[in-house]
Amino acid sequence: MDKKALKRLEYHKVLEQLAACSGSSLGREKIMAMEPLDNLQAILRKQEETSEGRKLLRLEPFAEAGGWKDIRAQLRKAGQGAILDPEELLAVADTLTAGRTIRKFFQDRQEQYPLLYEVSSALVSLPELERKIKNAILPGGEVADGASPELAQIRRRLAAAQAQVKEHLEHIIRSPSYQKYLQEPIVTIREGRYVVPVKIEHRSQVPGIVHDQSASGATLFIEPMAVVEKNNELRRLMAAEKREIQRILAELSAGVAQHAGPIGASLEALGELDFIMARARYSQKLDAWAPLLEGEACMDIRRGRHPLLQGEVVPIDIRLGADFDTLVITGPNTGGKTVALKTAGLLVLMAQSGLHIPAGEGSRLGIFRQVFADIGDEQSIEQSLSTFSSHMNNIVEIIGKAGPDSLVLLDELGAGTDPAEGAALAQSILEKLHSAGAKTVATTHYGELKDFALTRERVENASVEFDAITLRPTYRLLIGKPGRSNAFEIAARLGLPEEVVKRARSFLTAEHIQAEELMRSLEKTQQEAEAERRRAAELASEARALKERYEKIEADLASKRESILSKAAEEAQALVRAARLEAEAAVRELREKMAEEAARERENAIREAREKLRKLQQRVGRAVPEKTVPGEAPAGLRPGEEVFLTRYNQKGYVLEPPGAGGEVLVQVGVIKMNVPLRELRRVKEARPAGGQSEVAGVLLNKAREISPELDLRGLYADEALLEVEKYLDDAYLAGLSRVYLIHGKGTGSLRAAIHRQLSGHRRVKSFRLGEHGEGGLGVTVVELA
């Protein structure tokens, strides 16, 4: 890229602003060495890196990529075999820590930031070296006691020796016999040895070695002979400490030297990441965007802003290379022609450097292999060159180098010489560049160049807008419309007397005045039309906004209506559910009352049946003659023992042993009766064959009729509860001890109703759900009382 063009377009000032966004010297070096690229793929890569950095700033603004140092000097020093001091080693450890942390950060987010992750993958992880340095060096740069066992031992001995010396000297300075010889009762250090300040006139009273004298000469710093050997021991220990520290530092430095290559690559990656993040911060600062890039040399900049201008900047639209290759910008001085020229050139350089550009989304830029610029007055006093000669030197060089992939920016082309000759020369230069295929933007005052643009293919006029009402430039660039210099209006606004301006107008030809008036009228009409267009666009925008607002209101109302209707429906359903629950509760209460009534009736029937059974038993007892059964009446009967009732030809169980009357309380099935002892035989004894008694037959028939299972599936809850109530009574009469109520799994409501009925039931001892093989959740097993 042409170095002169970079300077004329003030590319270096962009780099200075960019460097201020960097966080390291390594990053700043990369920035100041940066130049525009001319390879599309390389530029795209740089732009994507900047975009990823911008994304990181947006999504994770507090992510920290600092904490590392520029340790290139330390790596070189260690590589040459030198010993690094503690601060240098600590800088290496801090850099290793930062690199490891940053690598882990991007490793966890490699899908979000693939390019940043790729750069960070070069960061080396040396946890062992990092640990050794941080264990050995304290944050302040002091070597830690635990750096080695030897150092810890030496320092313990050193502390003990220092304590002994101080204690001895403290004893001396507190001694009344010595205090009169001392300048002050203190212990101090001179030349690394502990001494006391002695008045010079008492030198002979304090035997020892003089190490120093005060500036006034009145005080001698003497090491008493009593502590000389102890001080010598201190010096030996201090020397040993120094040697051990040097050994530790040498060992750590050797570790750094061993890994100098990977650490250097890691440092380079850290610098590259800082470089990328500086570009991202600069993009954020400028509110810039990544342009759309393509291979052909062209530009379509929308709402572009010059990055170096402060305050409110009027954006410009400028295009080149699609419909035309040469753009001639005309208009007044101070109207913004040069700024438009510099903006176009600088945004091209920024984009090809991987920087986002301060322009609107959708801006497109092609790749220019060369950018040339002739901007400003570069007159050289040393070379005795005029303005015109200086410009011509630049243009001659540009014509010799420009080609199809070149962008040429020419400010005030043909200025500095005779207007007629300058205009002719300017046309010829533009023709030459046009025929070479260069993309050219030129500013000029010459009206002849407006005609040139109108008569040549792929050459277009443009102008910087001048407000005919306020007589001030608007700084907007209008492509397709030639401009006027507006010299008289500007001169009048700047204070030139009106009569001078009028006199100047009188020198113009009638044709020129007529053309100028026509141009002015056309410009005014165009500005009014543009103002009307903008007003129409604003009204259309307001109408769209109102439409969107009313549509939103309508949607909100529809949503609220749906919400109200939905809420009303829910409330209605809630009322229905509540009414249904109340009705079900009333029905359940009625059924419970009916069930209680039926239970009472069944209880009465059972009592009547029992009474009939008791009477029948008595009748049968009288009717059945006493049989003679072999064996004797059992002696020593105990409760629970099984016995055979000879009269009834049935087995039973002893409930109570024989009483005073010689009768035994025995239970046969559900019947309890007192039986004379003589009518009982132990079960193991033989019994006579014969038919069953009438009572036994009734009981056995009842037991045969009642199944131990009751299937309730398919019944409503109230029907099932009545069935259960009747069944429990029948099962109890039949002498069943366990029954199975089959209710199925279903929703569980029938099971719950049955369990409520069983809880506290007079016939129920306990109940549980069926186990595996018994029917599981679909069966309730009931133990009868």
Curated annotation (Swiss-Prot):
One GO BP annotation is: negative regulation of DNA recombination
User: What's this protein's function?
Assistant: Endonuclease that is involved in the suppression of homologous recombination and thus may have a key role in the control of bacterial genetic diversity.
Q: Which NCBIfam families match?
A: mutS2
Q: Which domain of life, per UniProt?
A: Bacteria
Query: What GO molecular function annotations does the UniProt record carry, in alphabetical order?
Result: ATP binding; ATP hydrolysis activity; ATP-dependent DNA damage sensor activity; endonuclease activity; mismatched DNA binding; ribosomal large subunit binding; rRNA binding
Q: What is this protein called?
A: Endonuclease MutS2
Q: Where does ATP bind?
A: G331, P332, N333, T334, G335, G336, K337, T338
State the Pfam families in the record. MSSS, MutS_V, Smr
Enzyme nomenclature, EC number:
3.1.-.-, 3.6.4.-
Q: Which InterPro entries match?
A: DNA_mismatch_repair_MutS_C, DNA_mismatch_repair_MutS_core, DNA_mismatch_repair_MutS_sf, MSSS, MutS, MutS2, P-loop_NTPase, Smr_dom
- Asked if Metal-binding is a keyword of the record, the answer is no
What the record says about family reads: Belongs to the DNA mismatch repair MutS family. MutS2 subfamily.
Q: Does the keyword NAD apply?
A: no
Q: How does it assemble?
A: Homodimer. Binds to stalled ribosomes, contacting rRNA.
Cite the entry's keywords alphabetically: ATP-binding, DNA-binding, Endonuclease, Hydrolase, Nuclease, Nucleotide-binding, RNA-binding, rRNA-binding
